[in-house]
């Protein structure tokens, strides 16, 4: 069940990386990028904690937020 939910959560990220991201300039302030972070967080921590970590990271990615190296815990 967790694998199915993880897969469903990763689909929009893969869609974004394949179709939307190539048409926009690079803007993520962090390394790894927010989409890479989301994929790694969901694969490493499962769908619930991974989604929480990914959303938290995306909310921090703005001009007045932090920047730099921020690995998945």
UniProtKB/Swiss-Prot annotation:
One of its GO terms (cellular component) is plasma membrane. It is found in: Cell inner membrane. Keywords: Cell inner membrane, Cell membrane, Membrane. The keyword Cell membrane applies. It is a peripheral membrane protein. Its main location: membrane. Disulfide bonds: none annotated. It comes from the Bacteria. The keyword Lyase does not apply. Signal peptide: none annotated. Could be involved in insertion of integral membrane proteins into the membrane. Belongs to the UPF0161 family. This is Putative membrane protein insertion efficiency factor. It comes from Phocaeicola vulgatus (strain ATCC 8482 / DSM 1447 / JCM 5826 / CCUG 4940 / NBRC 14291 / NCTC 11154) (Bacteroides vulgatus).
């Amino acid at each position: 069940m967790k694998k199915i939910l993880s897969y469903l959560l990763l689909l929009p990220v893969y869609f974004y990386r394949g179709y939307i991201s190539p048409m926009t300039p690079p803007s993520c302030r962090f390394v790894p990028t927010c989409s890479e972070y989301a994929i790694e967080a969901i694969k490493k921590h499962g769908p619930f904690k991974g989604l929480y970590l990914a959303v938290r990271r995306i909310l921090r990615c703005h001009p007045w937020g932090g920047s730099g190296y921020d690995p998945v815990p």
